[in-house]
């Protein structure tokens, strides 16, 4: 009987100790979580990717391509992502990108022109923002 009482006492005490440890680990975070807000440039890049993915499909199907969307010109003045800088390198690459992008619409060899535009994207992203390079490479028309 004494052994039974000792066992119950030990179990009771050990259960109480775990409760206090659990309570200390369940504290609420003191910092408020902030949702990511994409910059104008990040949103523009996403729109251009979507458009070029659709353009890629049109080229493959030999459909009419339409014309260069005007919003592509916003690459020259869209607000950059925090920590990124609009410098001469970026401005030169942006100008070259717009040139290669616009050439697609009047080209006799749209596949080659399109792939040149993809090269232009990658050449800038290698220096400025490497994250989306693998995604951009998927635009190539083989």
Language-model-detected regions and their locations in the chain:
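Sec-dependent signal peptide recognition
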Residues: 1-7
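The canonical Cys-X-X-Cys-His
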Residues: 117-129
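C-terminal motif of bacterial Sec signal peptides marking the signal peptidase cleavage site
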Residues: 13-14
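Extracytoplasmic c-type cytochrome modules immediately beyond a signal peptide or single-pass transmembrane anchor
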Residues: 18-118, 133-142
């Amino acid at each position: 009987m004494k052994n039974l009482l000792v066992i119950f006492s030990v179990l009771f005490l050990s259960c109480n100790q775990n409760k206090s440890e659990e309570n200390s680990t369940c504290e609420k975070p003191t910092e408020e979580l902030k949702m990511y807000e994409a910059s104008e440039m990040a949103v523009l890049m996403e729109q251009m990717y979507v458009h070029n993915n659709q353009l890629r499909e049109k080229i493959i199907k030999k459909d009419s391509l339409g014309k260069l969307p005007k919003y592509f010109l916003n690459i020259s003045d869209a607000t950059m992502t925090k920590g990124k800088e609009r410098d001469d390198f970026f401005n030169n690459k942006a100008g070259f990108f717009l040139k290669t992008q616009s050439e697609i619409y009047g080209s006799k060899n749209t596949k080659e022109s399109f792939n040149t535009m993809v090269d232009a994207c990658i050449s800038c992203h290698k220096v400025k923002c490497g994250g989306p390079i693998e995604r951009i490479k998927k635009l190539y028309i083989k």
